[in-house]
Amino acid sequence: MGKIKIGINGFGRIGRLVARVALQSEDVELVAVNDPFITTDYMTYMFKYDTVHGHWKHSDITLKDSKTLLFGDKPVTVFGIRNPEEIPWGEAGAEYVVESTGVFTDKDKAAAHLKGGAKKVVISAPSKDAPMFVVGVNEDKYTSDVNIVSNASCTTNCLAPLAKVIHDNFGIVEGLMTTVHAITATQKTVDGPSAKDWRGGRAASFNIIPSSTGAAKAVGKVLPDLNGKLTGMSFRVPTVDVSVVDLTVRIEKGASYEDIKKAIKAASEGPLKGIMGYVEEDLVSTDFLGDSRSSIFDAKAGIALNDHFVKLVSWYDNEWGYSNRVVDLIRHMFKTQ
């Protein structure tokens, strides 16, 4: 079986990290990148140096010419095309395209990549109409006739595996989620205009900012049994990466907190190994920086009021963990062909 050939549209936080994951994977080959807003030499700089995840150390990265990057001796074609219909993915050999601009998140817009020769598109964001898949939760529902999918959000990727384990073992009656979420690129460095979200316009590095999130409701799309049973909100906090989900649920089958811990630990060592983690050490957010798992349950941080009402805490590197799942979803789609 040959390598999985991927292209990336949008070389932002997720685009660059998906590239890092792909370039460190033996079964995946990055063949093309498109970004109309940055030059190839600047793309080299942005990829090589990363404030959060450190310098790229796995191969030399050089500029062959204005349309080609070299990772060691591996060429990657670079495009700078605004209209996704015009990106010649087929010529570059890209069969799977990661749509990571944050702009083309619905099916019709993402389908533009198919016109350029891509076979499948993975949207690295929630989508209002593309089917959403969370690896470890519902990727087995994917069928090869589906060409455009969403990898959901980083928060849904953290919450859904945890919710699945709890629901499968104890039954979730209802629940509320809060994500304490690191800063993202859409926030403001200083107070600025944000007509649709007034609080979101305040300085990211100086404030704890309440915000909305569809992550909890989206769990109902990947786990239909939980549709209408979960909702949530977000606090944006002044850290650059790593976030944490606080899930408070009422469960149907009475269980002690120890019982719940055992169920999560078993899942993390069994069917959800590599997706779900389990820790009992006294850790803080930076301890999870660079963790490739979607959801790392913090056994010491949770509490139970009684056998039916419990608060569960799970960490996630919202950049690196999510980027790994994008590539994992592509792997699954490739195997399903």
Curated annotation (Swiss-Prot):
It comes from Zea mays (Maize). One of its GO terms (cellular component) is cytosol. Keywords: Cytoplasm, Glycolysis, NAD, Oxidoreductase. Its main location: cytoplasm. Belongs to the glyceraldehyde-3-phosphate dehydrogenase family. Residues 152-337 are annotated as: Catalytic. Pathway: Carbohydrate degradation; glycolysis; pyruvate from D-glyceraldehyde 3-phosphate: step 1/5. It catalyses: D-glyceraldehyde 3-phosphate + phosphate + NAD(+) = (2R)-3-phospho-glyceroyl phosphate + NADH + H(+). One of its GO terms (biological process) is response to light stimulus. The active site is at residue 154. Plants contain two types of GAPDH: cytosolic forms which participate in glycolysis and chloroplast forms which participate in photosynthesis. All the forms are encoded by distinct genes. D-glyceraldehyde 3-phosphate binds at residues 153-155, 184, 213-214, 236. One of its GO terms (molecular function) is glyceraldehyde-3-phosphate dehydrogenase (NAD+) (phosphorylating) activity. The record marks 181 as: Activates thiol group during catalysis. Key enzyme in glycolysis that catalyzes the first step of the pathway by converting D-glyceraldehyde 3-phosphate (G3P) into 3-phospho-D-glyceroyl phosphate. Essential for the maintenance of cellular ATP levels and carbohydrate metabolism. This is Glyceraldehyde-3-phosphate dehydrogenase 1, cytosolic. Its EC number is 1.2.1.12. The keyword rRNA processing does not apply. NAD(+) binds at residues 13-14, 35, 82, 318. Homotetramer. PROSITE patterns: GAPDH.
